[in-house]
């Protein structure tokens, strides 16, 4: 087999594996939106079978042989070329996969599917004791996985590197600490301002049918292609890339809280815009894939927060909201805009404001790092979670459902995932600042309903690039700088200085 033949075989193998993963994504979407209650056991078996097939393909010895042939040639000499990008990521995936025994891969697939189902069943009643054994199993298997994969400094790094290539806990912790200090200063200034929004205006009665129409309109306005997607209700909102021409979003409606579904929709739309902008001609290979969860999150946060919470956006969209909901016809734009940007520590991460959100992430980062490193046991988790909530946000969850059980991530085995939310916020602010430097002020365009220039900019610099670069190098290429918390901090200072009447200068 020549190097060229080996590369073609690798590309075909990658494409076939991508189809299997696509089937899993479709099954996962169905499980979280439409599956009948009695269908879960069979679905778990389906996931386990898919995991078995995918793992077998990922550890096929022929992959190693073909990679060796290509790597010994000049096909990968240009690090930016499509072939080099694909070979780099195939090698990374293969080396990771062969370290995980098939039995462990299958056990993890089944345990996480069962764990997520158990979470959905027990969370409404805050039934920690029933849920706990499922989480114990998942944590034990994830610890075993970290040992199988290996790591440079600590077990947690093995999981963090999966979601954010090149990132380590030691490299991330200083960024989070610098951000934490700045966020607490902003929070202190806001709480000391004495100015408070009329928060009740977003807690009036908003019938679901009206919210559905607005969610659809908002997603379409930002550029989401409904001919290649759909919007459905779910318990825990997500987006999913089934494949080219099929990128779906979901949201969760609350008739008495406007922000939940609307901003959840903007968030998932941001994810979907990234997936819809990937180069379809490279689908099934790394060059056509996303960079990382953090970069993915940067796209959702950028559209949800930097765009969707801006005054410019609401100058365009608020008249449509008032047309839909008569209960807001007596509420001026500025009052509504202040209400949707209220800063107030909350129990629920997904309902947190922009200032306190990353404090939620920091405590989860510290807890899951301790869990994976063996410094914290599952039985100790509820108490540890409550202690950190009190220390960072001044709140104590009254029950596990509003505390340690509020997120699906750990039951699904997604350790190392939470930090990507904060990385996404950091990336988003830095990308947005660069976009404005190149395009000029964007809020004036938003007020006119013109979101295309920003989307086009993101398409060219991020979406179309696929997995050509890892996160930190991509940030350097797009912005010309290393990743820094300062852009996020400055953005938050500007926004909340205006809303809360704070003095000029840093705080």
Per-range role (PLM):
Residues 42, 104-107, 134-137, 175, ...:
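Secondary-structure capping and boundary motifs in well-ordered enzyme cores
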Residues 1-165, 468, 493-505:
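A well-structured
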Residues 108-258:
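Contiguous, non-catalytic segments that form substrate-binding/exosite surfaces or channel walls
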Residues 289-333:
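Post-HExxH zinc-binding segment in Zn-dependent metallohydrolases
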Residues 2-6, 22-28, 38, 42, ...:
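C-terminal, non-catalytic "cap/extension" segments appended to globular domains
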Residues 227-228, 280-285, 309-319, 378-379, ...:
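Acidic/polar loop patches that form or flank catalytic/metal-binding clefts of enzymes
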Residues 10, 150, 267, 300, ...:
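Divalent metal-coordination and catalytic microenvironments
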Residues 260-280, 297-301:
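Active-site recognition of the HExxH zinc-binding catalytic motif
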């Amino acid at each position: 087999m020549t190097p060229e033949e080996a590369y073609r075989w690798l590309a075909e193998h990658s494409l076939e594996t991508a189809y299997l993963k696509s089937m899993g994504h479709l099954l996962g979407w169905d499980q979280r939106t439409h599956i009948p209650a009695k269908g879960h056991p069979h679905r778990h078996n389906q996931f386990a079978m898919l995991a078995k097939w995918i793992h077998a393909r990922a550890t096929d010895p022929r992959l190693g042989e073909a990679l060796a042939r290509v790597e010994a040639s000049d096909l990968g000499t240009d690090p930016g070329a499509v072939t080099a990008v694909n070979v780099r990521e195939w090698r990374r995936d293969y080396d990771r996969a062969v370290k995980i025994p098939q039995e462990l891969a299958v056990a993890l697939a089944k345990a996480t599917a069962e764990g997520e189902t158990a979470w959905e069943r027990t969370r409404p009643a805050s039934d920690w004791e029933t849920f706990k054994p499922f989480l114990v199993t998942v944590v034990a298997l994830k610890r075993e996985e970290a040992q199988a994969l290996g790591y440079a400094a600590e077990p947690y790094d093995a999981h963090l590197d999966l979601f954010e290539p090149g990132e380590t806990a030691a490299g991330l912790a200083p960024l989070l600490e610098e951000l934490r200090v700045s966020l607490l200063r902003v929070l202190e200034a806001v709480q000391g301002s004495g100015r408070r929004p009329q928060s009740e205006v977003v807690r009036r009665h908003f019938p679901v049918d009206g919210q559905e129409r607005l969610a659809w309109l908002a997603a379409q306005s930002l550029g989401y292609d409904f001919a290649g997607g759909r919007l459905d209700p779910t318990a825990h909102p997500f987006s999913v890339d089934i494949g080219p021409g099929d990128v779906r979003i979901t949201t969760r409606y609350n008739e008495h809280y406007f922000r939940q579904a609307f901003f959840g929709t903007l968030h998932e739309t941001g994810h979907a815009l990234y997936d819809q902008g990937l180069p379809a001609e490279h689908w099934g290979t790394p060059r056509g894939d996303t960079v990382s969860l953090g970069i993915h999150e940067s796209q959702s946060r950028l559209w949800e927060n930097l765009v969707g919470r801006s005054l410019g956006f609401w100058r365009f969209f608020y008249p449509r909201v008032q047309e839909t909901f008569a209960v807001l016809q007596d509420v001026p734009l500025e009052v509504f805009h202040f209400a949707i940007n209220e800063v107030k520590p909350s129990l629920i991460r997904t309902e947190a404001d922009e200032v306190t959100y990353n404090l939620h992430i920091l405590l989860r980062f510290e807890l899951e790092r301790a869990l994976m490193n063996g410094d914290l046991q599952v039985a100790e988790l509820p108490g540890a979670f409550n202690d950190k909530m009190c220390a960072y946000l001044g709140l104590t969850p009254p029950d596990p459902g509003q505390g340690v059980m509020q997120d699906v991530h750990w039951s699904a085995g997604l350790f190392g995932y939470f930090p990507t939310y904060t990385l996404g916020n950091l990336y988003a602010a830095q990308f947005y600042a660069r976009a404005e430097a190149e395009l000029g002020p964007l809020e004036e365009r938003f007020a006119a309903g013109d979101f295309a220039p920003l989307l086009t900019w993101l398409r060219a610099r991020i979406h179309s690039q696929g997995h050509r670069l890892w996160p930190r190098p991509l940030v350097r290429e797009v912005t010309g700088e290393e990743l820094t918390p300062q852009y996020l901090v400055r953005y938050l200072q500007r926004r909340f200085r205006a809303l809360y009447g704070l003095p000029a200068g840093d705080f």
